[in-house]
Each structure stands twice: as structure tokens, then as C-alpha cells.
Amino acid sequence: MELVLKNEDVVSLLNSIKEANLAYQEDKQSHIKDFAKAQSPMCTLVMCCDSRAHSTSFTYNPENNFFIVRNIGNQYILNQGCVEYGVRVLNTPLLIFLGHTACGAVKASMGNYGNLHSSIIREIDHLALSIQKSDISTSCSAEERWRDAVINNVNQQVELAIKDFADLRLS
């Protein structure tokens, strides 16, 4: 399917984004001044880039509280440098991997995704390896296997991060 936008549609979309940003700045102006010069998040949050999954799902104020890293399937390896920056440079005391129900990337990794663009295939390949390592029951429904795969993916990402951050300990 080819997406065709008229110039006026693009201009309208950009103006809408600009207006929303200006309204946000006005609404949060005093709050933003508190951290304009430096960030000090309490958590590095790795989450899926699915447009339905948002950091505001569990906090009304993610600004300067979360160093957010997003990719398909909330994978550690795809953005390892970003995660390292949050944990080691910004010194966030928490690292959270946030999975979500009905993750399309996880579902794709469980099936045939060879018809997708090569850059997407490379990213899903990491998920597929993670899912294949998991012990997911084949005796349950496809929906239950998908749910279990989402959970197992989060667990796999946590295990990878634990290995890389083994030198860090709670004090």
C-alpha cells in the first residue's frame, strides 16, 4: 500500500505538532525550567516503540524522571549504547524493560517475517532468537503463546542486561 499525502496535508500535520508543542511548553514552562540545564532521571526505561505504549501510561510526569529508550520489542541489544548511557552516565538507579500486550514485533518473531524490509528483519531476528530460547508451551492457544512470548522476551532482555551490568551492585 502506498501512502500519498498532499502538501497541504503535510503542512497541516506539521502545524498541528508545532501547536501541540507550544501548548505543552506554555503548560509546563515552570516545570521545564527546573531541569533545562541538566537531566537527572530516576530510571532508564526500555520500551517498545508501538504508538499505543506510552511512558505516561504509568506516570503523569515522565519528563526528567525517565531516560526512555524505544525500539521494536523493547530490546536491549538494539540500543545497548543508549541503555549504557542511562545507567552508567546518568546513573539511573533503576533499569526497567517494559513489555506490552499484543506486541506486534513479538508476534512477527513467532512467525514468518521474511517478507518485511531487511532493516526490520534484522531487528526481529534478535527477538526471534530470544523467543526460540524460551520455553513456551505448544499446548496452549496462539493467543496464550503470544502472551507468554511477550513475558519471556522481557525476561530475556533483563537477563542480557544483568550480565552487562554485573559490575554494578546495590549499596
Regions inferred by a protein language model and the residue ranges of each:
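Terminal alpha-helical anchor/extension segments at protein ends
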Residues: 1-7, 55-59, 67
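Divalent-metal-activated hydrolytic enzyme cores
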Residues: 1-41, 72-90, 105-171
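N-terminal short beta-loop-beta anion/metal-coordinating cradle
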Residues: 26-65
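Short glycine-rich or small-residue beta-strand-to-loop segments that form or flank ligand, phosphate
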Residues: 43-44, 67-70, 96
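Short glycine-enriched loops at secondary-structure junctions
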Residues: 47-52, 72-75, 100-101
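A generic "cationic amphipathic patch" detector
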Residues: 58, 99, 108-110
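Ordered, amphipathic secondary-structure segments that act as subunit-interaction surfaces
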Residues: 94-101, 105
